[in-house]
UniProtKB/Swiss-Prot annotation:
The keyword Phosphoprotein does not apply. Its cofactor is Mg(2+); Mn(2+). It comes from Cupriavidus taiwanensis (strain DSM 17343 / BCRC 17206 / CCUG 44338 / CIP 107171 / LMG 19424 / R1) (Ralstonia taiwanensis (strain LMG 19424)). Gene3D superfamilies: 5' to 3' exonuclease, C-terminal subdomain, 6.20.10.30, BRCT domain, DNA ligase/mRNA capping enzyme, Helix hairpin bin, Nucleic acid-binding proteins. GO terms for biological process: DNA repair; DNA replication. This is DNA ligase. InterPro entries: BRCT_dom (IPR001357), BRCT_dom_sf (IPR036420), DisA/LigA_HHH (IPR041663), DNA_ligase (IPR001679), DNA_ligase_AS (IPR018239), DNA_ligase_CS (IPR033136), DNAligase_adenylation (IPR013839), DNAligase_N (IPR013840). It is an enzyme of class 6 (ligase). The gene is ligA. The active site is at K148 (n6-amp-lysine intermediate). Keywords: DNA damage, DNA repair, DNA replication, Ligase, Magnesium, Manganese, Metal-binding, NAD, Zinc.
Amino acid sequence: MTAKHRGAQAEASAPAGALPADAAASRVAWLREELDRHNYQYYVLDAPTVPDAEYDALFSELMALELEHPELQTPDSPTQRVGGEPLSAFDSVRHRVPMLSLNNAFADEDVLNFDRRCAQGLGRTAPAAGEADLFSAADAVEYACELKFDGLAMSLRYEDGRLVQAATRGDGETGEDVTVNVRTIKAIPLKLRGQAPAVLEVRGEVFMFRRDFDKLNARQAEAGEKTFVNPRNAAAGSLRQLDPRITARRPLSFFAYGLGELQGVERPPTHSAMLDGFAALGLPVCKDRAVVKGAQGLLDFYRDIGKRRDDLPYDIDGVVYKVNALAEQERLGFVSRAPRFALAHKFPAQEMTTVVEDIEVQVGRTGAITPVARLRPVFVGGVTVTNATLHNEDEIRRKDVHVGDTVIVRRAGDVIPEVVAVVAERRPADARAFVMPTACPVCGSHIEKLEDEAIARCTGGLICAAQRKQSLLHFAQRRAMDIEGLGDRLVEQLVDQGIVRTPADLYKLGVAKLAALERMADKSAANLVAAIDKSRATTMNRFIFALGIRHVGEATAKDLARHFGKLDALMAADEAALLEVNDVGPVVAQSIAHFFAEPHNVEVIEQLRAAGVHWPESEPVAKSPAPLSGKTFVLTGTLPTLSREDAKELLEAAGAKVAGSVSKKTDYVVAGAEAGSKLDKAEALGVPVLDEAGMLALLAQAGAAPAEE
């Protein structure tokens, strides 16, 4: 700890009121500097150095001192973010430098044409139409590439380093003055760091991180208030509140990406240097950006971000390309209220509107009855969508979805399409409300809904063909028994024709019977029989997972296998014994005990054993902390000898948690070849990075042996 920090700590021990005026002024100045520094490390560097409780203590002390000494309070103090009295309306603001929109590109050809126009405008020899990167290295145009955030465009005006005005984009010429609201956003500095220009107008985006959006909606729902459709709507609605105290409670963030008016300093030579300058002044700047040359560089950036889009912590709807040299931007100029030097390359829309033509119910593996909206076909998220999940009856009531409604449908990545909201003003007069059936549409069994559950279930069990089909598909999946070639259509035929009723029946199948089925030939039938035969040798944890016990996923199956060692011991365990297993609580214990108490399930297990399904067994392991218990790992890149799944199994077997993204709570990142942004973030946060050898050495040091396969 430095002398400065030691002195500050000593002063902190004295009550605020006990400090004389000079000491209070000194302490207030130090507290503001510390809070600004912590905000910079958190919002700009994404590398917080103190826990939230310590930050809150510093903030509370500053607030107490300012109350005790009101003459020390200043507009740029961190305490002034809480929001003042409500406004009657927002004033209009005329932008000194217009906030122009960008032209859009939706296809590669649009990008090639953009690059060609830029090259020609700068007097360079352009390639022929439809060809990319035929320039020499010297002739290729250099571009700055960044993300196109799905939020609300904002202009921040700083004078002598202090925030004096914030305005929305509006029509590009005139926006709304939202300064009082923007001052509540912790990511936006009220005072810039270092030597700030006399006037600096920063353009950027106010948005909401997905994690913060989810928490906000959870709070809204808990309070019985309206939830938001998406983070963009939440950000826009929060920023345009007439009561800034409401805005202060909303988790808004900000990224800077452009420059308006500038006085007192020379403009930087390039757009990328400008962004680096913003970060040095304490403004948050997105790290997912690059400088590339030529059209191929632009397309490579677009594809790289497209692959990672669903893993980003915020919503984007495309990427933006800008000629990097500011002097070249000026040469290219503007056309039709848009810059010639910039282009927005859009991703396929993740939200679209369409019409609900019907609402049907599907029956899942555990009997769950899921309402599904049958939609008028719509292209969203890169595919044509005709169905969307409605989750459960309560969700339909909450969203007020009727047959005939126009709805907003969202599809992101591999996520199942869902209806996120109804466009109420477009509801037709003949719209029909959904009524949950009382009997299963597949087997006719009674549908029941327990008081403490949101999901209704068919009570038919394996009598229900729909549940049998889903159970067989689960049993055969790669992470369970790994029976390659057993897909939906084949399972449909096997169940509908009465050939297979339980998983054990799969091991009785022969080539002749399979080859007689639709779309099956001798070769594909032989391949499937071979895959079924191969699956006889498995592991205990895979077998447990394959059984489809409710609430038992892969991780719990591994814990059960390690704890009991033998399947018979697990089957004989009562709820009290099951509660001795790591991470098994009362609900899971009850579900497991109930499953093995069902005679039909025991009979199927014995049939599977009789069919030759086997696995190595071991002695029970007493409940004790695993060597890496409590540690969080993130895997990125390609490891030299282990697949990512193998590495994950080794770490989980040692008690570690394997997460999908890097945060300040991550203990280690294991990086292989072609590691991407996760490695960059780990290095920025100071998270230890291991290669495969380092991970194996850590496992060996912890006494964790590789899991048997």
